[in-house]
Amino acid sequence: MESVLSKYEDQITIFTDYLEEYPDTDELVWILGKQHLLKTEKSKLLSDISARLWFTYRRKFSPIGGTGPSSDAGWGCMLRCGQMMLAQALICRHLGRDWSWEKQKEQPKEYQRILQCFLDRKDCCYSIHQMAQMGVGEGKSIGEWFGPNTVAQVLKKLALFDEWNSLAVYVSMDNTVVIEDIKKMCRVLPLSADTAGDRPPDSLTASNQSKGTSAYCSAWKPLLLIVPLRLGINQINPVYVDAFKECFKMPQSLGALGGKPNNAYYFIGFLGDELIFLDPHTTQTFVDTEENGTVNDQTFHCLQSPQRMNILNLDPSVALGFFCKEEKDFDNWCSLVQKEILKENLRMFELVQKHPSHWPPFVPPAKPEVTTTGAEFIDSTEQLEEFDLEEDFEILSV
């Protein structure tokens, strides 16, 4: 009983220290599209931050590829940040942005299933094993440090094998987001006997839409949108600061990947000119499923004070993330970008309606033909030959 009380008191101390570290100010804190008034809502702020899934270095997992490393300490921080961004997208997809986590409280089955996607086992679809081995197809050796764009490309390819979450992952190119390409990728016909074939001709679709019918009404595949950027040469250009902060205010925000060379962080919000981030640079022991099939999640939530960094100390190479569960969410995001991002004289990125004529034709990514199922698809790097090697756009200097 004393040990239980001691543990509880220690937790109270952590929370108190956390709350006292934030200044008594009237400024708003923005966390992934939600605002908190620091002076009166510190406990809500704590609850919101601690609800984010926190992935860190792990040790004592099965060797990657059978003979590779059994810990990602020292090299896996950007992969862990990518996991955190994707996990937030899955939380929004299945549980909603307003879902909250409480320690030792029974959680929805969807939460447990999301968590199991990221366990450090080769049969988990977004495990460190799968990400590291998929990185080989992006020119990265297992155990080599990744940049944000490489992680984005890896997530895009792994998502093709993830039928349960069924995400469309779009990674922008040349600082440009193309609306036409995203809608082509995300609009899918309902799976039925009548609509399982090819998409109807444009003329027929337009005709039905004009009549207000739903005979060929398309469904929307939830979108994970990642925008890799370079916001300066050696340091972030101050002209981008306001636009960068605006992205954390958008309801579609998944935060940003970035940090400093060889030190990746997952940025989830800001207070004034300070960015708030979750730090993966803590090495914890591998956690597996228990006998009842659940995962002990106590080490997957950060109950200590998240760190802060002045935005001007951020390395200029970053990747923004956004989640659009429905088409209306994407349309709203486009409106916000046009209002808040494109108004700047020096734009952080471009949003265009049509596919640029000088680009290669856009082909929505498709699952390669490999004779495996689900998350078990990569057992060796030989299978990576099914993927085309994309140009490596490393955006954090090593």
UniProtKB/Swiss-Prot annotation:
Its EC number is 3.4.22.-. One of its GO terms (biological process) is lipid metabolic process. The active site is at C77 (nucleophile), D279, H281. A motif (LIR) lies at residues 393-396. Keywords: Autophagy, Cytoplasm, Hydrolase, Lipid metabolism, Protease, Protein transport, Thiol protease, Transport, Ubl conjugation pathway. It is found in: Cytoplasm. GO terms for molecular function: cysteine-type endopeptidase activity; cysteine-type peptidase activity; protein-phosphatidylethanolamide deconjugating activity. Signal peptide: none annotated. One of its GO terms (cellular component) is cytoplasm. Changing S397D: Phospho-mimetic mutant; slightly increased delipidation of ATG8 proteins. Pfam families: ATG4_LIR, Peptidase_C54. The keyword Transport applies. Inhibited by N-ethylmaleimide. Redox-regulated during autophagy since reducing conditions activate ATG4A whereas an oxidizing environment such as the presence of H(2)O(2) inhibits its activity. Changing C81A: Reduces the redox sensitivity and retains activity in presence of H(2)O(2). It catalyses: [protein]-C-terminal L-amino acid-glycyl-phosphatidylethanolamide + H2O = [protein]-C-terminal L-amino acid-glycine + a 1,2-diacyl-sn-glycero-3-phosphoethanolamine. The keyword ATP-binding does not apply. Cysteine protease that plays a key role in autophagy by mediating both proteolytic activation and delipidation of ATG8 family proteins. The protease activity is required for proteolytic activation of ATG8 family proteins: cleaves the C-terminal amino acid of ATG8 proteins to reveal a C-terminal glycine. Exposure of the glycine at the C-terminus is essential for ATG8 proteins conjugation to phosphatidylethanolamine (PE) and insertion to membranes, which is necessary for autophagy. Preferred substrate is GABARAPL2 followed by MAP1LC3A and GABARAP. Belongs to the peptidase C54 family. Interacts with ATG9A; the interaction is direct. The LIR motif (LC3-interacting region) is required for the interaction with the ATG8 family proteins. Required for proteolytic activation and delipidation of ATG8 proteins. This is Cysteine protease ATG4A. The gene is ATG4A.
